[in-house]
């Protein structure tokens, strides 16, 4: 997918990886970039507008833990204004295994709810034009950081959901792929809580190993958007972009 002249909705587009990805997207010249985030950041929005004044950038406050009905209301406002949306990026995430319910609500249920809401506008069974979904998951969806099992499980769930979305594309007209960053230097990983304090130094230990910058991750994210491969499981780690082949151990047969 060429980003130029496209209409893009980016959930959590002002976060660590999110903000650098928004910068890279804006450089590629979309028609509209609509950022949905829990906390407004006027300085970041102004910076994005300055990068490419030809791009219309709009911000709406949004908490992914709201109901599908509330998400649908907001999306209706956006669709009424833009008429068409080409790409939805689901990027909300938290890393704090003290907050069990919120971790699941943000990292998994939020992705499901926002995706479900946009289907009202995209599903070809309802006369919709289809669309593309990029879900930010994590390499912990492949293999857990076992000291944060709640976070890791929430990302594995989001990855499984995304894989199913891709297989449903012939029915819905909506394609999907997952973006799975490795350990990236953001505020998310500088200090966080392990489950039941099983490893108080988990953040410190992780950062002793090679990482990547948010810019490296963002640049590869844009490459994945441009590749636009339905069902792709992209690993964005150590400055590289690699497609992962999923090992099948069971098949429903239907």
Curated annotation (Swiss-Prot):
UniProt record, GO biological process: alcohol metabolic process
Example of a GO cellular component annotation carried by this entry: cytoplasm
Record's catalysed reaction(s): a primary alcohol + NAD(+) = an aldehyde + NADH + H(+); a secondary alcohol + NAD(+) = a ketone + NADH + H(+)
SUPFAM superfamilies reported for this sequence: NAD(P)-binding Rossmann-fold domains (SSF51735)
Family matches, as Pfam families: adh_short
Active site: 151
GO MF: alcohol dehydrogenase (NAD+) activity
Name of the featured protein: Alcohol dehydrogenase 2
Gene: Adh2
